Amino acid sequence: MIVCLDSGNTRIKWGVHDGVKWLAQGAVAHAEVGALSRLVAEWPLPEKVMLANVAGVEAGSRIREQLAAWAPVFHEVRPELRRCGVTNLYKSPERLGVDRWCALLGARSLVDSATVVVMAGTATTIDTLDADGNFLGGVIMPGIGLMLRSLAHGTAALPFADGEYATYPRCTDDAIVTGVIDAQAGAIERIFSRLDDPAASCLLSGGYAEQIAVHLVVRHRLADNLPLEGLRHLALKS
């Protein structure tokens, strides 16, 4: 049994895998890290525990403390130059965010063609894999929630919008929501167009993925918890 933990900016996503399929997945807020103890109560000792952590040393330590008696050895993943069919062409490969690295590995395990890999969470990352598995690079932009909050907090007159997407928005809340979603979808489509590959696809994961996906005009599909898929793939290949 493999346990995969993706410690992100907002939540800790977890998954239990038996080598063939996911048995369970879930998420807890960092403030509720104690809830991870239910893994100890509900599951037998794992063969491997895989951890990807972008939330800092303290967050990683709290996770380890909760699971120490049950999983004394953690395999904490670091970005590498080459692994599982992905070549990391970042200027300094080790400085790529481990969440992005795991998402790329997860995407490559699901699709062997050129792929735009989108993680739509607190931040939105849009990364490109070519058909040979080379990570060409990517962009980081504020996620939907951050964009909405920045307009509410950074202006005197604009609210925290609770509007709906509209082709031609005719109220302020709709105008804000539409602008934010169009910014996200437009960035994805712009980067997708650079691939110039008729077989290319786009994978979207993260809390805002579905909200963006319905407005995309490029070939795409949703993929649950791509970083967990990457951790799973690493565990099975190592």
Curated annotation (Swiss-Prot):
**Protein's recorded name:** Type III pantothenate kinase
Q: What is its main location?
A: cytoplasm
Catalysed conversion reaction: (R)-pantothenate + ATP = (R)-4'-phosphopantothenate + ADP + H(+)
Active site residues per record: 99
Quaternary data? Homodimer.
The record describes how the cofactor is bound as: A monovalent cation. Ammonium or potassium.
Quote the subcellular location field of this record. Cytoplasm
Q: What is its EC number?
A: 2.7.1.33
- Binding annotation for substrate: 90, 97-100, 172
Task: Tell me the Pfam families matching this sequence.
Answer: Pan_kinase (PF03309)
Indicate the secretion signal residues.
none
Residues bound to ATP:
6-13, 122
Which regions span the lipid bilayer? Answer: none
The gene from which this protein is expressed is: coaX
Question: Family, per the entry?
Answer: Belongs to the type III pantothenate kinase family.
InterPro entries from the UniProt entry = ATPase_NBD, Type_III_PanK
| High-level lineage | Bacteria, Pseudomonadati, Pseudomonadota, Betaproteobacteria, Rhodocyclales
Annotated source species:
Dechloromonas aromatica (strain RCB)
Q: Which SUPFAM superfamilies match?
A: Actin-like ATPase domain
